Swiss-Prot record:
The keyword Cell cycle applies. SUPFAM superfamilies: Homing endonucleases (SSF55608). It comes from the Bacteria. One of its GO terms (biological process) is regulation of sporulation. The gene is whiA. Involved in cell division and chromosome segregation. PANTHER family: CELL DIVISION PROTEIN WHIA-RELATED (PTHR37307:SF1). Belongs to the WhiA family. It comes from Exiguobacterium sp. (strain ATCC BAA-1283 / AT1b). This is Probable cell division protein WhiA. Keywords: Cell cycle, Cell division, DNA-binding. Pfam families: HTH_WhiA, LAGLIDADG_WhiA, WhiA_N. GO terms for molecular function: DNA binding. The keyword Cell cycle applies. Residues 276-310 bind DNA.
Amino acid sequence: MSFASDVKKELTQLEVTDAEAKAELSALVRMNGVISLALGRGMTLDVSTENASIARRIYSLMKRLYDHPLDLFVRKKMRLKKNNVYIVRVSQHAETMLRDLEILGENYEMIRTLNSDMTGDENLARAYLRGAFLAGGSINHPKTSSYHLEIYSLYENHNQALRDLANRFELNAKTLERKKGHILYMKESEKISDFLKLIGATRGMLEFEDARIIKDMRNSVNRLVNCETANLNKTVGAALRQVENIKFLERTVGLDVLPKKLREIAELRVTHQDVSLQELGEMLESGPISKSGINHRLRKIDQIAERVRSGDEIASS
């Protein structure tokens, strides 16, 4: 089972008040419901999902709030993944339910925006967002390369209303048009964690946080190792260049042309090619000097080597 499925299963097991149940159901029906009209039968509502736990949640919320006759069907998808599709059907009093959920208007128009009666209270807003996530939400497991949570909506005005609702909780949610619909999305790990907590997925939030912390620690260690490796490569490269320049001087003009202080450090560098500048400074017979002092003397040797390569005469010490 995927991380998103685990989160949704947890959400379907939450205990809620009647008002919260209504807000959650309103989102589920608005986003996953299909209305049909037939002569002699009136209005029928089908709410479909591929998740059995969500289907049970829809069924139980409808029974709790309305106690209308309900049917539950299971069909097999014929395209791509041949998953089961669960359909909760309301054949009687569908119009009454849709009006009560503020989905169907007085003139039989579909209401895509959110009424303050349904989401004005903070707990109701949380419940509606929970229903929206159950209906059209997905989330990457934090172990994957990127953090991403999204909720798909068919209609732009409802998607914008969801964004505004989420951002009442400072989640920095954004919207994007997709083929055949619109999405609300979040990519900041802290905001995704806050959203999971907000809608009641406490276990999911804790699992997300655990994985995120481990991932961030690994990334920090990798950055540190990469930085240290780069510094080591830089140090090794500098040491090789220094040794090459000293040996070049030794072959061409001899190290005796160097001032005593430079000659001393040149001989130590060639003899001890693997030690650090600090260690070189501690080996000097004339007395220890700092890392920056050693670096300064080695740069002087590099400059003298370049002058010799250029044909300049070097006065002996």
